């Protein structure tokens, strides 16, 4: 998995139009991910984004419900997001059981903006077959972002751009928010290809991407 250009993206690269949505590995116009796109989630870390990885800090002081187990997918599990106010988990955010035992990390997010799913890349000692239907998983509440961060800004509203943001450290993108186009959904994804209008495609590594996207591979 690699990136060209500073800041986790370069200004070239094809991205679909369309604001507001997530998508996994599945293709389709209006998605952010391998093909690029404006102001959404991206595949991989890069400079100046959220979730560049880092060391394990241990379990948090408290955890909140983030998802329900739906089904296994290869060695990962697919969950329906059940956060309050549809808050969005960071990519690579640790996922726990209720007893704060870490089971893995957020890998991909896909589906409709207000009805979305995510996959968990399990830790080496975990098996997807060991979980039950609708079993709940948990997350550090500090690893959740408000859904409004990924919605297009209303006409005439002033303030910093949504979706991309300036990022942290060097090379943060200036993102243009939700981008042009209609309302959204997540595209593709291993969890079953939830469609919808244009959107962000996102997965491993994390962070928000500004500009027109990035070229990324594995």
From Swiss-Prot:
One of the record's GO cellular component terms: telomerase holoenzyme complex
The protein, known as: H/ACA ribonucleoprotein complex subunit 1
Assembly and binders: Component of the small nucleolar ribonucleoprotein particle containing H/ACA-type snoRNAs (H/ACA snoRNPs). Component of the telomerase holoenzyme complex.
Gly residues bias spans: 1-56, 161-218
Keywords: Nucleus, Repeat, Ribonucleoprotein, Ribosome biogenesis, RNA-binding, rRNA processing
Pfam family, one: Gar1
GO aspect biological process, one term: rRNA processing
InterPro entries tied to this protein: Gar1/Naf1_Cbf5-bd_sf, H/ACA_rnp_Gar1/Naf1, Transl_B-barrel_sf
Record carries keyword Cell inner membrane: no
Ranges where the record places region RGG-box 1: 4-49
Gene (name only): gar1
Compartments where located: Nucleus, Nucleolus
Record region (Disordered): 1-57, 149-218
Record has Ribonucleoprotein as a keyword: yes
Family designation: Belongs to the GAR1 family.
GO molecular function: RNA binding
Residues in coiled coil: none
SUPFAM superfamilies, A to Z: Translation proteins (SSF50447)
Domain of life: Eukaryota
Region (RGG-box 2): 162-214
Chief localization: nucleus
């Amino acid at each position: 998995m690699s990136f060209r250009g500073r800041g986790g993206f370069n200004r070239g690269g094809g991205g679909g139009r369309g604001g507001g949505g997530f998508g996994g590995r599945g293709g389709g116009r209006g998605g952010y991910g391998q093909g690029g796109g404006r102001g959404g989630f991206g595949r991989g870390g890069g400079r100046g984004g959220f979730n560049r990885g880092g060391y394990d800090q241990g379990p948090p002081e408290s955890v909140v419900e983030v998802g329900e187990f739906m089904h296994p997918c290869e060695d990962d599990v697919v969950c329906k997001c059940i956060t309050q106010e549809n808050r969005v988990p960071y990519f690579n955010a640790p996922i726990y059981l209720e007893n704060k035992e870490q089971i893995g990390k957020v890998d991909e997010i896909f589906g409709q903006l207000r009805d979305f799913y995510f996959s968990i890349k399990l830790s080496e000692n975990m098996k997807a077959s060991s979980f039950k239907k609708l079993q709940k998983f948990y997350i550090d509440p500090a690893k959740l972002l408000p859904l409004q961060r990924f919605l297009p800004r209303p006409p005439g509203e002033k303030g910093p751009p949504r979706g991309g943001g300036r990022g942290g450290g060097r090379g943060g993108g200036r993102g243009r928010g939700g981008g042009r186009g209609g309302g959204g959904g997540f595209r593709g994804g291993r969890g079953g290809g939830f469609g919808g209008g244009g959107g962000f495609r996102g997965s491993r590594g994390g962070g928000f991407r500004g500009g027109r996207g990035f070229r990324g591979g594995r």
